[in-house]
Design a protein with these regions (language model features):
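Solvent-exposed, flexible loop/coil segments flanking beta-strands in beta-rich domains
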Residues: 1-39
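Residue-level recognition of well-ordered beta-strand positions that form the cores
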Residues: 51-53, 110, 126
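C-terminal interaction-tip segments
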Residues: 1-8, 112-131
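Beta-rich globular "head" domains
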Residues: 28-65
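Noncatalytic modules at the cell exterior or secretory-pathway interfaces
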Residues: 92-121
Length: 131
């Protein structure tokens, strides 16, 4: 769910309850982002802040990961376990990969296949938009 979006940033929320099989869910779809005032399309997202909760299970499987989508194998941005808040704005955010391979530049929420059924994952993330 997009909570707020403008030319500079987008804030996205996702709530995922595991069914025990693992999942990859598109979290930040750059092709669905609004164009800026000059008509340019968003090409990449830079993680600025994240609020998260990865709870439930026996403790060994209650984690999630944000990845940048790539046909050659997804590129991890950050791992999330427990609950908390991180602010990366002081140094410009966690930049995603912008190499010349087959990046699609979408950001995915990945829940491991070892997750117990009913584990809950909530992530609210603020991204800077790059054009």
């Amino acid at each position: 769910t997009i909570m707020q979006e403008n030319d500079v940033r987008v804030v996205i929320k996702i709530v995922n309850q595991s069914d025990g099989t693992g999942a990859t869910t598109v979290f930040g779809d750059v092709s669905a982002m609004a164009n800026n005032a000059n008509g340019a399309s968003c090409l990449h997202l830079v993680l600025q802040r994240v609020w998260y909760s990865a709870q439930g299970g026996d403790g060994g499987d209650s984690y999630a990961r944000l990845d940048e989508e790539d046909d050659d194998g997804d590129i991890p941005i950050i791992g999330l376990t427990g609950s908390g808040y991180w602010d990366f704005r002081e140094f410009g955010g966690l930049k995603t990969d912008k190499s010349n391979n087959t990046n699609q530049s979408d950001v995915n929420l990945v829940v491991p296949s070892t997750a117990d059924a009913a584990n809950m994952y909530t992530v609210i993330a603020e991204f800077k938009k790059l054009y």
